[in-house]
């Protein structure tokens, strides 16, 4: 039996934890996840998906502000290996060294490309046609450890970040389990990351505003890359309208001002980018309302009209 301590917080983390927990070759002897967060709207405490799974399956769960605070407790578990999936917290070197096989980290990009906390968003924003699942040894430098194995896959050109996440969530758990078994079996295949890295850091608030001066392909990639969350937006009459799906239509034959609505139909809202390029906004979200197709919005009262502007 392989004794594991799991570090993770997100929905992807929970999927990987569940797969490890259900595999008869593993024993999950402890889980470390982020401290609970308080919902500012209703003041209720929100558990991470990982903590909820631990409660349901009676797995010891630790939630330190800093993981070095539980070094003694983790040492007492005498685990063989640590596993990290989207933990969201720096792991101290003293914690890494508790485990004979160190800590294996799953990262959903073709490392050394897109080190950081938002590789899925940046895969779509950058228009990548391929990506990878990477299992690396966790080291102090962010996502810089030697690579155990990578599993390449094609990125569907129609995917947004949500679609890519669903793919990763479906395929990552079993790939991770395969790698863990190989690591503990003593096979020695670690390879250092040699090529220069790029970074896929967390999306900043100011990056959520879409740029109408981009080339059409880049604009569409930003729409897809920010969808469904956090959602890229454009300003319209004082409101931030999220643009969750858009398509490039082509170039206007006449000169059109950037951001101007040129046509509204059941297919969507046509607006101009720079150089008279036209994109079709198909799914949008008005503040306080759910995301809707434009075909549904125009059936009711709405503020949009030809000649008005997005900014």
From Swiss-Prot:
Its EC number is 2.1.2.9. Coiled coil: none annotated. (6S)-5,6,7,8-tetrahydrofolate binds at residues 109-112. Keywords: Protein biosynthesis, Transferase. SUPFAM superfamilies: FMT C-terminal domain-like, Formyltransferase. It is an enzyme of class 2 (transferase). GO terms for molecular function: methionyl-tRNA formyltransferase activity. One of its GO terms (cellular component) is cytosol. Pfam families: Formyl_trans_C, Formyl_trans_N. The keyword Transferase applies. It catalyses: L-methionyl-tRNA(fMet) + (6R)-10-formyltetrahydrofolate = N-formyl-L-methionyl-tRNA(fMet) + (6S)-5,6,7,8-tetrahydrofolate + H(+). The keyword NADP does not apply. Belongs to the Fmt family. Attaches a formyl group to the free amino group of methionyl-tRNA(fMet). The formyl group appears to play a dual role in the initiator identity of N-formylmethionyl-tRNA by promoting its recognition by IF2 and preventing the misappropriation of this tRNA by the elongation apparatus. This is Methionyl-tRNA formyltransferase. It comes from Mycoplasma pneumoniae (strain ATCC 29342 / M129 / Subtype 1) (Mycoplasmoides pneumoniae). The lineage of its organism: Bacteria, Bacillati, Mycoplasmatota, Mycoplasmoidales, Mycoplasmoidaceae.
């Amino acid at each position: 039996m392989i004794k594991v301590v799991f570090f993770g917080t997100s929905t992807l983390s929970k999927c990987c934890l569940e797969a490890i927990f259900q595999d008869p070759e593993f024993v999950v002897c402890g889980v470390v996840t982020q401290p609970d967060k308080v919902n500012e709207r209703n003041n209720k405490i929100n558990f991470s998906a990982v903590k909820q799974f631990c409660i349901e399956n009676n797995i010891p769960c630790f939630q330190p502000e800093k993981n070095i605070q539980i070094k003694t407790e983790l040492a007492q578990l005498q685990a063989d290996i640590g596993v990290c999936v989207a933990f969201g917290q720096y792991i101290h070197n003293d914690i890494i060294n508790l485990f004979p096989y160190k800590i294996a980290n799953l990262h959903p990009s073709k490392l050394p490309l897109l080190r950081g906390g938002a590789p899925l968003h940046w895969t779509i924003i950058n228009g990548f046609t391929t990506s990878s699942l990477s299992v690396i040894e966790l080291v102090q430098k962010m996502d810089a450890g030697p690579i155990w194995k990578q599993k390449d896959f094609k990125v569907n050109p129609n995917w947004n970040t949500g679609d890519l996440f669903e793919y990763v969530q479906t395929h990552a758990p079993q790939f991770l389990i395969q790698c863990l078994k190989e690591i503990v079996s003593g096979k020695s295949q670690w390879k250092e990351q040699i090529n220069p890295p790029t970074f896929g850091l967390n999306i900043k608030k100011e990056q959520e505003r879409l740029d109408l001066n981009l080339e059409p392909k880049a604009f569409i990639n930003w729409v897809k890359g920010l969808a469904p969350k956090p959602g890229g937006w454009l300003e319209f009459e004082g409101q931030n309208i999220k643009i969750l799906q858009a398509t490039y239509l082509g170039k206007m034959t006449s000169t059109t001002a950037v951001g101007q609505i040129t046509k509204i139909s059941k297919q969507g809202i046509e607006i101009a980018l720079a150089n008279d390029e036209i994109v079709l906004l198909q799914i949008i979200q008005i503040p306080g309302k759910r995301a809707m197709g434009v075909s549904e919005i125009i059936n009711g009262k709405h503020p949009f009209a030809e000649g008005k502007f997005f900014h």
